[in-house]
Amino acid sequence: SNAFSAIFDSNLTSIITGIILFNFGTGPIRGFATTLIIGILISFFTAVFLTRLVYEYFMNKDKWQNITFTTGLSKNLMQNVHFDFMGRAKTWLTAGAIAAVVCIGFLATRGLSKSIDFTGGRNFKVQFENEVEPEQIRELIADKFGDANVSVIAVGTDGKTVRISTNYRIQEEGNNVDSEIEAYLYEALKPVLTQDISLETFIDRDNYTGGSIISSQKVGPSIAEDITTSAIWSVVLALLAIGLYILIRFRNIAYSIGSIVALAFDTLIILGMYSIFWGILPFSLEIDQTFIGAVLTAIGYSIN
């Protein structure tokens, strides 16, 4: 009976974040939220009901009477181990405060590497026949696109595919703007295309001969603003919803406030780490809708 309440609370808080994620997410994010909720419900059903049935069945047949859940290694692994967390509360609080200040400082000064989901712009995933350096590709495109923001990151591990993000002419409307930008991209990347391919081949999503665009995405400024607003609200509502559930469940405002502060701290540390290390680590730390989904999932599990 004591175990059930802990299992129920931990699963319900994760479902709360899944529901919020479904309501504020789009496309694949909603799919992830649906999968998360279904997975939690099935896991809860099997852990609480089916597992109990199996154990009762075998025990009623006088089997598994001496079953244990330890091994020779784990049985004595934590014997006589005592961590005096509360005795060193000032140390942990000081370390946490320093970490929070550092993260806030980096977020305020360096910010985050935002994807076009939050800035608006175009993504082009381009595959080459030979390995290329992202910085080399960025310089070629920057010369052609002038003052527009251009970022290039490697995709995969073969070194032949990159994702190009730019806000070049994103404010312009018209039927020919997209095709003109693809033509500019073709001209800029000619030095690294291995064959004398035509523009038609380069923009053909099904033809990878000599290097070509294999996918593209456009997010307009108004859509990017809506996504940004939804992302902020989803995180705030997740914190408040879990805090409200804790208040209703345990009837103690201190528990509710403590849970919100702890979850907000965890979220701040995640954002701070991304702010500190983007551009330093050899892989992308770009913030997009998938990242927001990961943060909400972390919030749901962190409360446990």
Task: Place the predicted regions along the sequence by residue.
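A structural signal for conserved, well-ordered secondary-structure elements
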Residues: 1-304
